[in-house]
C-alpha cells in the first residue's frame, strides 16, 4: 500500500520548508507565526494580493519571499 504524502516542499525566504498538503497561503502564514496584517508576500516572483491569500493553494516547488513591516522611530 502506498503512503499518501501529507506535506509538500516549498522555499520561504531562501530556506527549504514544508507545508501541509492543501494549505493556503493564509494557512502558511499562520503556520509560520506571522501577523498577516504586517507582511507582503511574493509568490514565484509575483506579488500576491492580500485578498487572494485565503484562496491561493500552496503548490509543490513554490518560492515565497515574505517581508515583514516593522514600525519604529
Regions found by a protein language model. Name each.
Residues 1-72:
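Ubiquitin-like/PB1-type beta-grasp interaction modules and other compact soluble beta-rich domains
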Amino acid at each position: 500500500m502506498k503512503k499518501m504524502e501529507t506535506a509538500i516542499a516549498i522555499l520561504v525566504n531562501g530556506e527549504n520548508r514544508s507545508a501541509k498538503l492543501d494549505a493556503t497561503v493564509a494557512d502558511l502564514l499562520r503556520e509560520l507565526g506571522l501577523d498577516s496584517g504586517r507582511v507582503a508576500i511574493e509568490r514565484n516572483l509575483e506579488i500576491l494580493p492580500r485578498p487572494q491569500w485565503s484562496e491561493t493553494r500552496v503548490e509543490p516547488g513554490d518560492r515565497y519571499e515574505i517581508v515583514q513591516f516593522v514600525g519604529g522611530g
